[in-house]
From Swiss-Prot:
It comes from Nostoc punctiforme (strain ATCC 29133 / PCC 73102). It comes from the Bacteria. HAMAP family: KptA. Its EC number is 2.7.1.-. Keywords: NAD, Transferase. GO terms for molecular function: NAD+ poly-ADP-ribosyltransferase activity; tRNA 2'-phosphotransferase activity. The keyword NAD applies. This is Probable RNA 2'-phosphotransferase.
Length: 181
């Protein structure tokens, strides 16, 4: 698919996911989300057909990360720049080269096998320094700290957030980006 097609789709999505969703018959849910299937149907009805693959390409190729999918891949939103009322709460940010995760020693084998998963939370929580990760890990017994290759994950398309209190958030950390320290 051509770069010009991706730019055209990106501009179209910007207009309707940021400014005038009602003009194509979509309603943004809290956080600015809309169902991918609903968006694809609305675009087709408005004579601008888009495929799921094109949406994925726009999301993945956008250097400014204008759009993101939720963790299930069933919802999409514009990350910023809205003129309609949307409380996004978090905006994607570029992480430092390394982040850290503290846990108890009982979880190490599982983490090494499957990576870090969000479990019942919305995101995996990461620390910017080893000391904080050790403190977090100590809540679960003898602490173990993992270094996360955050820059490499980001380059691979993983989206990071930083909360107001400095906790770094990501949907998951695959084992290939982890190193026990």
């Amino acid at each position: 698919m051509s770069d010009s097609r991706l730019v055209k789709i990106s501009k179209y999505l910007s207009k309707y996911l940021r400014h005038t969703p009602d003009a194509i018959g979509i309603k943004l849910a809290p956080g600015g989300w809309v169902a991918v299937d609903e968006l694809i149907t609305a675009c087709a009805k408005n004579k601008f057909p888009i495929t799921r693959q094109e949406l994925e390409a726009v999301v993945e190729s956008s250097e400014k990360q204008r759009f993101s999918f939720d963790s299930t891949g069933t919802l999409i939103r514009a990350n910023q720049g809205h003129s309609v009322e949307v409380d996004l709460q978090l905006e994607p940010v570029v992480p430092p080269d390394e982040l850290y995760h503290g846990t108890g020693h009982k979880s190490v084998d599982s983490i090494m096998e499957t990576g870090l998963c969000k479990m019942s939370r919305h995101h995996v929580h990461l620390s910017k320094d080893i000391a904080t990760a050790q403190t977090v890990g100590a809540r679960h017994g003898k602490p173990v700290v993992f270094a996360i290759s955050a820059a490499a994950m980001h380059q691979a398309g993983y989206i990071f957030y930083c909360s107001d209190n400095g906790v770094w958030l990501v949907d998951r950390v695959p084992p290939e980006y982890l190193q026990k320290i």
